[in-house]
Design a protein with these regions (language model features):
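Membrane-integrated ABC transporters
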Residues: 1-47, 62-83, 98-102, 106, ...
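Alpha-helical transmembrane segments of multi-pass membrane proteins
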Residues: 39, 87-106, 157-164, 183-209, ...
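Helix-loop-helix
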Residues: 64-65, 172-186, 260-338, 343-347, ...
Length: 639
């Protein structure tokens, strides 16, 4: 594609972004924003008409000078000054109003935008976060929002005012003299050409600057999260070099963006001064030669016309320079808005499920399952049959079957090949294998964080694609290897598993997980405030809270994704007793580094490069003397 075509597409994209942004602002403030526009227009008109009062005053002075009678001039001048003062007072009041209102509109719009972005982010699939750096995502909430703030609060109102002033002053100049207006038009055409030439390059680099800023912030966030690893491997110099490379790219595009922006104003300022001189020369020559004036007012060309015309020329050129200055801020704001809209336009996680999870009870008269409006401790799948319209209640038992499943994180690279897994209600099924064998991938598919490429997954005989994702995930308690604790009290973090849980239920869950003992020894017990992902706790303590969080949800099925791999041996013994109680009567999928945690599993599935190579319980697999036997005896390593 040619550079011209690319530039044209970029202009069209920015135009669409501006239109969408303005529509959005009017949608947020349908009454206040039009009032602001009216206030800005009023201020612009008032700022433009000063020259007309100067012309009237000069006309009065000229007539009095010629007649020698100054008595009639005094009341006329006083009237002009009083009128001008009243008009400017209205302008000041209007300016105060729209500036205060614009602050409300700006901050309110940004608040709503942040809400929209965060809500959209909650609807995005896990795949989005796998392919986007967290720092780049955070940049939407910081840099992009900040550039948008400057644009909405300052640049857009000033740009509108500048355009109104230019249009108003231009028509006033036409009213006084068409001949001198032609000189203005010729000069403005050249100034517009320079603005377009330099401004387009500036806009291109400002957009690149926002993108590179997101890359730099993403890299900083990544290194900060892995700071221990950087120091452990003595890679400080490598990290610095990687950062310098990204920072250099940001410097290059920022330098070019600001270079074009900074040279534009002096050039336009000098062109404006040159135009002022040309208009002054033209006016003087016309006066000296007695050239007949052509104007909408019909006035003859005189000092009373030329002097205010020169003032308007200076004002006109100054406003052209203001436009070029505001355009840079607008372009930066549009670059930020475009990135924000890209996030808002991301496709949400698809969910065509219609089977829901409900509290159930047995009708004493019919002995049939029915939906209950309160917590009964019994769960059922509410399955509407679309063909007949009948509703079937299927007991949630935790019977899960994966039938010949293929899956790849990218279409051209499969990581699971023909995997078939079955778990009977209440069974403990363990996945073992080396890193990359596909253990965690299987649990991601059970949760429907990703959708399979081929095959079927059935939960209690129901295709999981028919089950609403939120209900499917509510039926599965999850303990992840990477623990995330949120800013809040210990009680809040335990309750995260079930926001309706009482304090007593949270404490009971903590006791089950073996976390109550250390929690009660914290300075404020369950009211101890956690910050920085629970940085004041040990890895084992954080893991125990994560397990308690899963326990308070009281899920019918559990996924333990390498739950005890980061816990010391003593803590593991504490956890294991609680976990055994938690797993009673529940279908449980376990992934662990230590084979001691899976020895009592009903079924152990051995994976290698996305394929199941062995299945059986511990004794059966030891007797086979195959892959599991090699792992157990230390001939192979689990990781």
């Amino acid at each position: 594609m040619s550079k011209a075509a690319t530039a044209e597409r970029a202009r069209n994209r920015r135009g669409g972004t501006m239109t969408r942004l303005i529509k959005m602002l009017f949608g947020f403030y349908p009454v206040l924003l039009p009032l602001v526009v009216a206030g800005v227009v009023l201020c612009a008109i008032i700022n433009s008409i000063g020259a007309t009062f100067l012309q009237s005053a000069l006309q009065v002075i000229s007539e009095s000078w010629q007649s020698g009678d100054w008595t009639a001039a005094q009341p006329k001048i006083l009237k002009l000054v009083t009128t001008l003062g009243c008009i400017y007072a209205v302008g000041v009041a209007s300016s105060l109003f729209w500036n205060r209102a614009m602050a409300v509109i700006t901050q309110g719009s940004l608040e709503k935008l942040r809400e929209k972005m965060f809500n959209r982010m909650q609807d995005l699939p896990i795949r989005y976060f796998d392919t986007h750096q967290r720092g780049d995502i955070m940049s939407h909430y910081t840099n992009d929002i900040d550039t948008l703030r400057q644009m909405i609060s300052q640049s857009l109102p000033n740009l509108l005012m500048t355009i109104i002033v230019i249009v108003t002053v231009f028509f006033i100049m036409l009213y006084y003299s068409v001949w001198m207006c032609l000189v203005i038009i010729a000069g403005i055409a050249f100034m517009t050409f320079m603005t377009k030439l330099l401004g387009s390059n500036s806009a291109r680099f400002f957009i690149a600057q926002q993108t590179e800023l997101g890359v730099v912030e993403g890299h900083i966030e990544e290194v900060m999260n892995g700071q221990k690893v950087v120091k452990a491997f003595c890679h400080e110099s490598t990290a610095e070099a990687d950062f310098d490379e990204r920072n250099e790219k940001l410097f290059e595009v920022s330098q070019k963006a600001n270079m074009y922006a900074n040279i534009l104003m002096p050039i336009l300022g000098n062109l404006g001064d040159l135009l002022y001189v040309l208009v002054a020369l033209t006016g003087g020559i016309f006066l000296a030669l007695g050239v007949p004036n052509l104007s909408l007012s019909g006035m003859a060309l005189s000092i009373a016309v030329v002097v205010p015309f020169l003032n308007m020329t200076k004002q006109f050129c100054g406003q052209i320079g203001q436009i070029s200055q505001q355009i840079n801020a607008v372009v930066m704001g549009l670059a930020g808005a475009e990135r924000i809209f890209e996030l808002l336009d991301e496709e949400p996680e698809a969910d065509e499920g219609y089977v829901t999870l409900v509290n159930a009870q047995v009708n004493p008269d019919t002995w049939q399952l029915e939906e209950a409006d309160h917590h009964t401790g019994m769960w059922a799948w509410k399955h509407p049959h679309r063909a007949t319209g009948e509703i079937e209640y299927v007991p949630l038992r935790g019977d899960l079957v994966m039938d010949n499943v293929d899956f790849g994180y990218t279409p051209d690279h499969e990581v699971l090949h023909g995997v078939s897994v079955y778990a009977k209600p209440g069974q403990k099924v363990a996945f073992v294998g080396a890193t990359g064998a596909g253990k965690t991938t299987i649990t991601n598919l059970i949760n429907r964080f990703y959708d399979i490429a081929d095959g079927k997954i059935r939960y209690d005989g129901i295709n999981v694609n028919k089950i609403r994702k939120s209900d499917l995930r509510r039926s599965l308690g999850v303990v992840l290897q990477d623990v995330n604790l949120f800013t809040g009290t210990v009680m809040d973090n335990v309750r995260y598993g079930n926001l309706d849980a009482t304090d007593e239920e949270c404490i009971k869950a903590a006791k089950l997980a073996g976390a109550d003992d250390f929690i009660t020894r914290l300075p404020d017990g369950y009211d101890t405030m956690l910050t920085g992902n629970g940085a004041q706790l040990s890895q084992g303590q954080r893991q125990l809270i994560s397990i308690a969080r899963a326990a308070v949800a009281d899920p019918p099925a559990m996924i333990l994704d390498e739950a005890t791999s980061s816990i010391d041996t003593r803590t593991e013994a504490i956890v294991q007793a609680g976990m055994d109680k938690l797993m009673e009567g529940r279908t449980t999928f376990v992934i662990a580094h230590r084979l001691s945690t899976v020895r009592n599993s009903d079924a152990i599935i051995c994976l290698d490069h996305g394929r199941i190579i062995e299945r059986g319980n511990h004794d059966e697999l030891i007797a086979k003397r195959g892959y599991y036997y090699q792992l157990y005896t230390g001939a192979f390593e689990l990781e």
